[in-house]
Amino acid sequence: TTYNSNVGGDGVALCSTAHPIDGSTYANTPTTQVDLNEATLLNAQISIRTNFRDQAGLKVFARGKKLILPPALEPVGIRLTKTELRPGTADNDVNAILSTAGGIPEGYMVMDFLTSSFAWYMLTNIAGLAYMNRIPFETDMQVDFVTDNLLTKGYQRFSYNYFNPRAIFGSFPTS
């Protein structure tokens, strides 16, 4: 699957409706998982801006900055983030996605390795996703004495984790 629901340091999955804070919780995923469209993207932008809280329950300055999509949702991402007028209508209303909460300043990115064709994510301006490069990629080679073939090998150790779930908002619809 695209999403690994293993629990993090706060005892819940990375994208959860119940991240614990002092006496309450906050969500970085919709209560009901939703497909990507104009309304759900606007709701995500507003939810990030209004619902993200710190450990004391105080509002933090959080804004969506980049949309992460599987290849199947790239056309939807283009329509939502690249049009000046409201997508999918004959109205000449402005595209609110481009202005709400500062818009999506870094646009979208297509991740070819997401295995769900429907899940989508919004990275925020808050640091919290971690890539730990424990041993950088190294290669070695030698010529096989018997066959005269060139033998090569590569080795690397790394891991991914998170330390602040406010770094991402995600939705995982099944269709």
Segments and roles (model prediction):
Residues C15-A18, D22-T50, R63-K66, A72-S175:
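Sequence/fold signature of self-assembling virion shell proteins
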Residues T1-D10:
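Short, glycine/acidic-rich hinge or "gate" loops at secondary-structure transitions
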Residues T1, T50, D54:
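Conserved helix-loop functional segments at active or binding sites
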Residues Q55, K59-G64:
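Short gly/pro-enriched beta-turn/loop segments at secondary-structure junctions
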